[in-house]
Amino acid sequence: MTHRIYNFTAGPCTLPLAVLESAQAELLDFQGCGMSVLEISHRSKRFEAVHEETLALAQELIAAPADFQPLLLPGGAHQQFDMIPLNLLADGGSAAYINSGIWAEKALKEAQRVGDAREIWTGRDSGFTTLPDALPPLPADCRYLYLTSNETISGVQYRDYPTAAVPLVIDASSDYYTRAIPWERCAIVYGGVQKNLAPAGLALVFVRRDLIKDYPRVPKFLTYAAHAAANSLFNTPPTWQIYMLNKVLHWIKDSGGIAHFESESIAKSGLLYDYIDHSNYYQNDVPPAYRSRTNVTFRTPSPELDTRFWQEAEPQGFAGLKGHKLLGGIRASIYNAMPIAGVEALIDYMQTVAAKNA
């Protein structure tokens, strides 16, 4: 096996080694058909079986009820920023958005191009390091409350999802399949798969079936009804991403399911935060109640030392530690496939850097 390093990139994510090795073994000849999975038709019986199993596994592992339709859609999370208001506000009404960070803000701005989307709370004044402790009033005729479960850039995450008088729409991209979902409160739950589940190029979307309707004034490709009717095969799908998603879902199931990975997420992030909090060299700006378990942001005493930290990390076996360009600093993304040994190794490196620059 070639040398592997610890990949802390925010996305595309690190993938389980067992999944990569399995895909490598099948790459040239998928199930004895003499072709790669990259080459086979999305209408073939072999791929149809993969596709159907992926949808079923996705629904089973996250315990989505039967009244939710799983969809595998192109365009990642960005396309959902538009599809959600185009469908849920097609016949009027308003929507409430909690602006918890850059990703929630992007969704809000797109929704405002489509319909009456209101920002009911913003964390901008705190530098997006907090979340609302109480739910603000909702606008009249509100159809849904939109929130981003976890903000990868600033590193904030909801510990508990709010209860509202309207259903929730949750962007769960960066903590998908690391925690349970309160389905009884939801209208749509979605996420780009590139954080925890597969290579980039796909969104896994769950839509409550009673909300799947054909709206004549919405382009057909942007309706959930068209994709549901075609069983997520309305256009030629990204077969490789679906194949890899299938393998990662099997790996999640074989590893103990979401309950196992939630426990792991708490343990891994807890180790790193505990070291940062007791260090005189590193600092995290997010209050403990709002800290992300999947994207840990921190900084050293100066921007120059931040840069040196992540530049010198790669030769030591670590990738992807540079903070987002809008925030700077350092960021360690700890998704499901990151072993606890990777976090322990990172802490060892952090201790070495701190001692050297003390």
Regions found by a protein language model. Name each.
Residues 1-5, 315, 328-358:
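PLP-dependent enzyme catalytic core of the Aspartate aminotransferase-like
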Residues 169, 183-194:
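Conserved active-site segment immediately N-terminal to the catalytic lysine
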Residues 193-273, 287, 356-358:
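Active-site C-terminal subdomain of aminotransferase-like
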Residues 34-83, 87, 102, 110:
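Conserved N-terminal alpha-helix of the aminotransferase class I/II PLP-enzyme fold
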